[in-house]
């Protein structure tokens, strides 16, 4: 993590000939927003004097109480490597303040900060490593995105089958220019599908990095004449894109508290409790980690996405997997989230659920180490295995029943988010789709 001072940033802006600075933040959906200023206005911004209309942002303020201010996080200063070398463009990620100087409680970044602070109070640091998947599609003659690709590549393929290889390479190099430690990148199962994994870090920095990652991917793809999409399931009968979260807790001296060499699985009681908390709250959490109608098209058996609420030390079909540890570092992989999620809210509910498991000493059921997709309904029922919500409205109903998870977000954000998502689902179910026309028009 950078440790910049105000003077550091002013000096870098002058030395690097930075002409514009983008003050970035997210709405409740995780859409990146920004206010652009020239370098002459930077000192004003660093004094938290940059005001904007909060009523224009989804999930923020009412018209009658809409004056809000951006408070830059100095450690997030980065210069965009793809912009011109003269009059460069930099960015600062920002927290949101109300007019009275207090923090805006529904700012997604602040929501995550609150849960991180709760963990710190009991001696834990929350580290997360995401696995972000996306598609690279062609654009049409007007430059608009399509779901078409010439390539036929699959898992771990390379050029000439992998036509997006050059774009993916430039994405990785750009990320490294911006300070990312990229661990690996490769082609995924579906044609035109890719994955880039960057090193785990503390949760707030990881959420910031996910937002930066999505911006870089879309920007570099466009330079290659491609459209990058993080839509979870853009094509029928193909694998969808997820964002597996590899999570661990560390104590005040940096030790992984999920480790226990005396346990048969190498896992501490805190690790089991954390899993128990995730499994207890996962139905409600899914409303946040899988936030759009299309998210639930990914939850189909046989397409590398979880359907069942279970865990395993090695099996990849359940919701939660414990990957082979690297040097005794146990991590818990939650396989359901997708990249449509607001990363700040997604990580907030993941950590909060795990902490509830630890505080309440919630032991998970026994692990299931066989292929869940090959188990009959009777076998699943006998094992006590339940399913994730199968659509956005079902997830919303589960969310509304879970007071603990709702409390993580706060009443104001809960109200605005659920209202917006119910409207989204109602719009969806009233649509007449191409599938319906093909199925019924000619015979009814």
Task: Indicate where each model-derived feature is located.
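Loop-centered beta-sheet repeat module
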Residues: 207-214, 223-231, 243-249
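Short glycine/proline-enriched loop/turn "hinge" motifs that connect secondary-structure elements
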Residues: 81-88, 125-127, 185-190, 238, ...
């Amino acid at each position: 993590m950078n440790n910049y001072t105000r003077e550091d940033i002013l000096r870098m802006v002058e030395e690097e000939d930075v002409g514009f600075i983008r003050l970035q933040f997210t709405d409740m959906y995780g859409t990146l927003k920004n206010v652009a200023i020239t370098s002459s206005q930077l000192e004003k911004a660093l004094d938290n004097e940059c005001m904007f209309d909060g009523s224009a942002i989804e999930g923020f303020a009412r018209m009658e109480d809409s004056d809000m201010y951006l408070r830059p996080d100095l450690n997030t200063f980065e210069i965009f490597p793809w912009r011109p070398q003269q009059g460069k463009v930099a960015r600062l990620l920002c927290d949101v303040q109300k007019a009275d100087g207090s923090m805006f409680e529904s700012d997604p970044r602040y929501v995550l900060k609150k849960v991180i602070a709760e963990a710190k109070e009991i001696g834990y640091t929350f580290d997360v490593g995401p696995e972000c998947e996306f598609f690279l599609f062609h654009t049409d003659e007007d430059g608009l995105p399509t779901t078409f690709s010439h390539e036929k590549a699959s898992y771990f393929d390379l050029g000439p089958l992998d036509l997006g290889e050059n774009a993916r390479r430039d994405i990785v190099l750009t990320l490294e220019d911006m300070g990312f430690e990229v661990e690996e990148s490769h082609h995924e199962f579906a044609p035109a599908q890719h994955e880039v994994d960057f090193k785990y870090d503390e949760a707030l920095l990881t959420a910031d990095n996910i937002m930066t990652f999505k911006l870089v991917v879309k920007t570099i793809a466009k330079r290659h004449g491609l459209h990058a999409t993080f839509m979870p399931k853009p094509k029928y009968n193909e694998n969808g894109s997820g964002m597996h979260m590899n999570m661990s807790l560390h104590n005040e001296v940096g030790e992984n508290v999920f480790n226990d060499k005396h346990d048969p699985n190498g896992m501490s009681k805190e690790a089991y409790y954390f899993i128990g908390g995730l499994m207890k709250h996962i139905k409600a959490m899914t409303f946040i980690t899988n936030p759009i109608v299309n998210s639930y098209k990914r939850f189909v058996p046989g397409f590398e996405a979880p359907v069942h609420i279970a865990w395993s030390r090695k099996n990849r079909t359940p919701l939660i997997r414990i990957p082979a540890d690297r040097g005794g570092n146990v991590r818990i992989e939650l396989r359901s989230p997708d990249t449509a999620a607001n990363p700040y809210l997604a990580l907030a509910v993941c950590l909060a659920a795990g902490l509830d498991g630890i505080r309440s000493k919630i032991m998970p059921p026994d692990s299931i180490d066989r292929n869940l997709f090959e188990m009959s309904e009777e076998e699943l029922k006998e094992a006590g295995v339940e399913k994730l919500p199968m659509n956005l409205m079902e997830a919303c109903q589960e969310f509304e029943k879970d007071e603990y998870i709702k409390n993580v977000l706060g009443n104001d954000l809960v109200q605005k988010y659920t209202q917006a998502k119910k409207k989204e689902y109602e719009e969806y179910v009233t649509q007449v789709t191409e599938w319906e026309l093909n199925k019924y028009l000619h015979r009814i």
